[in-house]
Amino acid sequence: MGLPGPIHDILLVFLGSGIVLGSLGVILLTNTIYSAFSLGFVLVCISLFYILSNSYFVAAAQLLIYVGAINVLIIFAVMFMKGSEYSNDFSIWTVGDGVTSLVCTSIFFSLITTILDTSWYGIIWTTRSNQIMEQDLLSNVQQIGIHLVTDFILPFELISIVLLVALIGAIAMARQ
């Protein structure tokens, strides 16, 4: 946005304070519905940060994905969950829980050591087509698409694996 400097700074201060107050609301409010609404407020403020930095596509994705889908899903899950079922019963860990946490922790540490020990400099993942480079890309969406399949292919694939694991975990929890 082409805002003058002082107005831009004032908006940044208001959005930053909104994020801090909203995140405190997420942590400190005892009612989970109010905490979910505070989370929605924080996500909207983050989206407005993206608008201030001229990243309109990321702001729209933030609103659609996080506020529109994830936060609504959290609110519905909290509303349909029985409160007494989880508040009084604290079950003791079983052997399966210990084995699962041990396996997950070992996979996590092996991934961290692999990432830290790999020399990432000089790795060429893909090459860009000359036709794509010669074209004058018209929109930010095309630029994002080109970067996702060339420069950021490894993080893109890692995020897809994390989302797949989260989906499998959600299905496993829903079946119980």
UniProtKB/Swiss-Prot annotation:
Pfam families referenced in this protein's UniProt entry, alphabetically: Oxidored_q3
Primary location class: plastid
TM regions (residue ranges): 10-30, 32-52, 61-81, 92-112, 152-172
Top-level enzyme category: translocase
Localization (cell): Plastid, Chloroplast thylakoid membrane
Transmembrane helix among keywords: yes
Catalytic reactions on record: a plastoquinone + NADH + (n+1) H(+)(in) = a plastoquinol + NAD(+) + n H(+)(out); a plastoquinone + NADPH + (n+1) H(+)(in) = a plastoquinol + NADP(+) + n H(+)(out)
Functional description taken from the UniProt entry: NDH shuttles electrons from NAD(P)H:plastoquinone, via FMN and iron-sulfur (Fe-S) centers, to quinones in the photosynthetic chain and possibly in a chloroplast respiratory chain. The immediate electron acceptor for the enzyme in this species is believed to be plastoquinone. Couples the redox reaction to proton translocation, and thus conserves the redox energy in a proton gradient.
Assembly behavior: NDH is composed of at least 16 different subunits, 5 of which are encoded in the nucleus.
Protein known as: NAD(P)H-quinone oxidoreductase subunit 6, chloroplastic
Lineage: Eukaryota, Viridiplantae, Streptophyta, Embryophyta, Tracheophyta
